[in-house]
């Protein structure tokens, strides 16, 4: 049997070496971090420097925010009736606005990115100017006579919006109903991405001049960004 004192001495030497190595490692690790408690009280509640910059396709890395309802009209024969769209959300991660509503038997979701909203707002402003000048053109409802035509994401389904496409054709055009001008957003049937021979439904959203004014105000980019200001502050404030 080996002497106990030799075992203790060897253990003591080994422990001392380990302690010295750990101490050195701890010092090296601490030196890797740049930290300081030298800050002023008035530096609280500032936006973290690491918060991502807003762009045309990105506002913040936060969840969707519900927006106030938007009012359109639906047409039956020569009569129009209100169509209230209450499920509207701003998607900060893509700077898109989603509109969810029922059209006939279908639940429908229309998604407009900022570039599309800008086109629609420009058409709205042109329509209002023509309305005020009493120069709204009396034209046949068609893509050819539209203020503009483009594509957007549109999804639909009887229960959920599981069918549709990212490039649904639509256009914006004036239409007279009972001798009064309205602004029409017409979604044309477009083949879906489901792989089947199915098409999106034909959908018409009408707006009176006052509803056009309200739509312009609600879809104003500054107002949309204001709606997430408090959430963004909570998400990124130090």
Language-model features: locations:
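Bacterial N-terminal signal peptides that target proteins for export
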Residues: 2-13
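Sec-dependent, cleavable N-terminal signal peptides
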Residues: 17-18
């Amino acid at each position: 049997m080996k002497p106990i004192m030799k075992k203790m001495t060897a253990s003591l030497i080994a422990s001392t070496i380990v302690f010295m190595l750990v101490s050195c490692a701890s010092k090296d690790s601490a030196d890797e971090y740049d930290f300081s408690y030298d800050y002023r009280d008035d530096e609280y509640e500032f936006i973290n420097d690491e918060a991502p910059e807003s762009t045309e396709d990105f506002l913040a890395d936060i969840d969707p925010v519900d927006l106030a309802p938007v009012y359109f009209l639906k047409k039956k024969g020569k009569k129009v009736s209100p169509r209230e769209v209450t499920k509207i959300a701003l998607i900060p991660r893509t700077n898109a606005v989603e509109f969810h509503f029922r059209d006939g038997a279908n639940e429908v979701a229309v998604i407009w990115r900022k570039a599309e909203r800008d086109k629609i707002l420009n058409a709205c402003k042109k329509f209002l100017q023509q309305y005020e000048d009493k120069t709204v053109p009396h034209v046949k409802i068609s893509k050819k006579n539209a203020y503009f035509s483009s594509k957007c994401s549109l999804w639909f389904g009887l229960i959920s919006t599981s069918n549709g496409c990212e490039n649904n054709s639509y256009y914006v055009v004036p239409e007279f109903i009972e001798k009064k001008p309205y602004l029409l957003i017409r979604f044309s049937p477009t083949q879906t991405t489901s792989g089947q021979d199915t098409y999106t439904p034909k959908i018409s959203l009408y707006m009176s001049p006052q509803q056009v004014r309200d739509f312009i105000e609600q879809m104003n980019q500054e107002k949309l960004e204001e709606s997430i200001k408090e959430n963004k502050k909570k998400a990124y404030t130090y």
